[in-house]
Swiss-Prot record:
TM segment ranges: 307-327
The name this protein goes by in its record: Netrin receptor UNC5A
Extracellular side: 26-306
Organism: Homo sapiens (Human)
Keyword line: Apoptosis, Cell membrane, Cell projection, Developmental protein, Disulfide bond, Glycoprotein, Immunoglobulin domain, Membrane, Phosphoprotein, Receptor, Signal, Transmembrane, Transmembrane helix
GO cellular component terms attached to this protein's record: membrane raft; neuron projection membrane; neuronal cell body membrane; plasma membrane
């Protein structure tokens, strides 16, 4: 049977559609030419064609085609037909021409694009059919968007003179689409259209044509595309001005001494920002011409004046000599105390007196003398034992235990003990007068090479100064401060959140030969797949810098952070201001919130307020709320609960239920209260809480029973069953008693450490050298579960010392020395004598 020629394209489209619908197979297609004799005006014409698009993260992209007239439209991607079931089709009729119109949409996923290997890019195009033939659309390329983290070139700090040109190079990270670059000056955007003195080159370098004093700032290169925004390290640019002399003044009148003078100042311009001072003198003196000089004989008044001036000068010189002598005497006394370290490292045990050096009679060891004075010193480096055995074995766990009293005696033959003076110098002093005076949030002390420890009670914040971290011969006053978030401006970008308190230790710039360990709590739920954690440090200019990206540590880094479930331990040789900041990588990232319910201890009115606090699950946040509630006269009415708050952008809701209407009436006008997501996630707002006000029907009502729910929308939640007597129920008051941390806020020398000094030294000397059988510091780290970053320990002169320091920071003051002794003894060292300490060594 003959078929009319005009029906062939339609039949071909129907057959092709039936084949795709039935088999779902993908095959190459041959596009037909227009049918001979057909009207070319009726070929499909595309109203919408697919365009190039980028896949961001894991979100699929949508491609759209629309053609008229069209009886069929199919997508072809990388030469293969897309299955019909993956097409979303809409048919309509063009209003003006009455021709059939078709619109087709498909989704392309990241997995489909990633299946294409090699140099070929993933592309898709549409093929439309009509009764007159077929038409192809343009190709649309689908690319996966990304932006690397590391800049190929970052700007470097510069010091330039006034009116000199400045070029700050910046090569952004590799990315698709290519990153756009902008520059920040002290966090303000640099706009070349507003400042003709600056421009940005095609290579993204920032150029300042002529440096001005106002150009002194921190410059940051920012790269961004549709995926992310990256910041380079800030580069400090200092524009300095060298000083120049002003013109000489006129000569002064001729004086009685037949001289006159003229002066000038280093003010044309004055040196700025570290510029060089003017060279030469600012005063010029010359003899006067003889006829201008007036000669007069010195009278009795002048002689008396000269004698008085000479007497004053002599007195000042004598006073200066006395002060120098007193200073040298004190310094000599302190050096004699510190120079013979056996007095300190032997635990102040008595040995025979003899001069230690022929040329220095001040260096003496100590001999027992029952007739002399005795000075007590808190702590010891070596435990004493009154039994007949002269040796201690480390393999017995109790040998690492401290003495009950922890006190040892130092015998000295002088009436005024040098040790007493030395210990008094190492005690805490009221020294840092310029620091915040909040006594509960600050501690400070004086330390030398023996080390020590600073603690802010009931906050989980401490600073461990290991032995030999301070150079011998140096004495530092060191402080430790907890800051309120509103007092310190910590900029948080994007989804970043503060996970720890903001803590300062200082003074900055002191020389340390070993890393100190800063311990502080955090409220993040550690998960490498959910969090990007960064340690931030404030620079001397006031800006915050990322000094460590957890999980990307390198042995050469100056910092290391041991992250645990609720605390972090920061190794640093540079003191300063630190904070732990997290950036959520997925909605699974969660912060721990502690929920606390408070109510008045005494209620004299009919109204009764229940305050629900939602705070970071850290000791310092708990301490602040407890102190606040003590001032308000509040009491805890339920045991605290922990809620996991996720980065889902959903708010926190609180509601109260099952209030007995015959006894109480709720004054809440809505069914629930909310705390906005960003108020919690930001982490810088304190005392976040909601108040539920209940009213007693009768003044005699004292029993309260209800339920209180706290939950994140589409997330975790907690419920409290409240059932207590508001006048006499205090069973939860004991939960408010803050744990008293052992010792004082500042511990100096041996009393700051659990491990006796000589035993510590023997462990270090035994485990530092590599051992073929594995009985070295690596095995000790594994036994103590400190093997997450062995390369950091290996980069230090004594890896064992780093491990023991971290153990001290984690376990003070309640560490189990028996477990440590068992771990060391279980290494199987062949020479047990390495862990033996004799009375002579003590």
């Amino acid at each position: 049977m003959a078929v009319r020629p005009g029906l062939w394209p339609a039949l071909l489209g129907i057959v092709l559609a039936a084949w795709l619908r039935g088999s779902g197979a993908q095959q190459s297609a041959t596009v037909a030419n227009p049918v001979p004799g057909a009207n070319p005006d009726l070929l499909p014409h595309f109203l919408v064609e697919p365009e190039d698009v980028y896949i961001v993260k894991n979100k699929p992209v949508l491609l759209v085609c629309k053609a008229v007239p069209a009886t069929q439209i199919f997508f072809k991607c990388n030469g293969e037909w897309v299955r019909q079931v993956d097409h979303v089709i809409e048919r309509s009729t063009d209003g003006s021409s009455g021709l059939p119109t078709m619109e087709v949409r498909i989704n392309v996923s990241r997995q489909q694009v990633e299946k294409v290997f090699g140099l070929e890019e993933y592309w898709c195009q549409c093929v439309a059919w009509s009764s007159s033939g077929t038409t192809k659309s343009q190709k649309a390329y689908i690319r996966i968007a990304y932006l690397r983290k590391n800049f190929e070139q970052e700007p470097l700090a510069k010091e330039v003179s006034l009116e000199q040109g400045i070029v700050l190079p910046c090569r952004p990270p590799e990315g698709i689409p290519p990153a756009e670059v902008e520059w920040l000056r002290n966090e303000d955007l640099v706009d070349p259209s507003l400042d003709p003195n600056v421009y940005i080159t095609r290579e993204h370098s920032l150029v300042v044509r002529q440096a001005r004093l106002a150009d002194t700032a921190n410059y940051t290169c920012v790269a961004k595309n549709i995926v992310a925004r990256r910041r380079s390290a800030s580069a400090a640019v200092i524009v300095y001005v060298d000083g120049s002399w002003s013109p000489w003044s006129k000569w002064s009148a001729c004086g009685l001494d037949c001289t006159h003078w003229r002066s000038r100042e280093c003010s044309d311009p004055a040196p700025r920002n570290g510029g060089e001072e003017c060279q030469g003198t600012d005063l010029d003196t010359r003899n006067c011409t003889s006829d201008l000089c007036v000669h007069t004989a010195s009278g009795p008044e002048d002689v008396a004046l000269y004698v008085g001036l000479i007497a004053v000068a002599v007195c000042l010189v004598l006073l200066l000599l006395v002060l120098i002598l007193v200073y040298c005497r004190k310094k000599e006394g302190l050096d004699s105390d510190v120079a013979d370290s056996s007095i300190l490292t032997s635990g102040f045990q008595p040995v025979s007196i003899k001069p230690s050096k022929a040329d220095n009679p001040h260096l003496l060891t100590i001999q027992p003398d029952l007739s002399t004075t005795t000075t007590t010193y808190q702590g010891s480096l070596c435990p004493r034992q009154d039994g007949p055995s002269p040796k201690f074995q480390l393999t017995n766990g109790h040998l690492l235990s401290p003495l009950g009293g922890g006190r040892h005696t130092l015998h000295h033959s002088s009436p005024t003990s040098e040790a007493e003076e030395f210990v008094s110098r190492l005690s805490t002093q009221n020294y840092f007068r310029s620091l915040p005076r909040g006594t509960s949030n600050m501690t400070y002390g004086t330390f030398n090479f023996l080390g020590g420890r600073l603690m802010i009670p009931n906050t989980g914040i401490s600073l461990l100064i290991p032995p030999d971290a301070i150079p011998r011969g140096k004495i530092y006053e060191i402080y430790l401060t907890l800051h309120k978030p509103e007092d310190v401006r910590l900029p948080l970008a994007g989804c970043q959140t503060l996970l720890s308190p903001i803590v300062s230790c200082g003074p900055p710039g002191v020389l340390l030969t070993r890393p100190v360990i800063l311990a502080m709590d955090h409220c993040g739920e550690p998960s490498p797949d959910s969090w990007s954690l960064r340690l931030k440090k404030q620079s001397c200019e006031g800006s915050w810098e990322d000094v460590l990206h957890l999980g990307e540590e390198a042995p050469s880094h100056l910092y290391y952070c041991q992250l645990e479930a609720s605390a972090c331990y920061v190794f640093t040789e540079q003191l300063g201001r630190f904070a732990l900041v997290g950036e959520a990588l997925s909605v699974a990232a969660a912060k721990r919130l502690k929920l606390l319910l408070f109510a008045p201890v005494a209620c004299t009115s009919l109204e009764y307020n229940i305050r629900v606090y939602c705070l970071h699950d850290t000791h310092d946040a708990l301490k602040e709320v407890v102190q606040l509630e003590k001032q308000l006269g509040g009491q805890l009415i339920q045991e605290p609960r922990v809620l996991h708050f996720k980065d889902s952008y959903h708010n926190l809701r609180l509601s109260i239920h099952d209030v007995p209407s015959s006894l109480w009436k709720s004054k809440l006008l809505v069914s629930y209260q909310e705390i906005p997501f960003y108020h919690i996630w930001n982490g810088t707002q304190r005392y976040l809480h909601c108040t539920f006000t209940l009213e007693r029907v009768s003044p005699s009502t004292s029993d309260l029973a209800c339920k209180l729910w706290v939950w994140q929308v589409e997330g975790d939640g907690q419920s409290f069953s409240i059932n207590f007597n508001i006048t006499k129920d205090t069973r939860f008051a004991e939960l408010l008693a803050l744990e008293s941390e052992a010792g004082v806020p500042a511990l100096v020398g041996p009393s700051a450490f659990k491990i006796p000094f000589l035993i510590r030294q023997k462990i270090i000397s035994s485990l530092d050298p590599p051992c073929r059988r594995g009985a070295d510091w690596r095995t000790l780290a594994q036994k103590l579960h400190l093997d997450s970053h062995l390369s950091f320990f290996a980069s230090k002169p004594s890896p064992t010392a780093m491990i023991l320091n971290l153990w001290e920071a984690r376990h003070f003051p309640n560490g189990n020395l028996s477990q440590l002794a068992a771990a060391v003894a279980g290494l199987g060292q062949p020479d047990a004598g390495l862990f033996t300490v004799s009375e002579a060594e003590c």
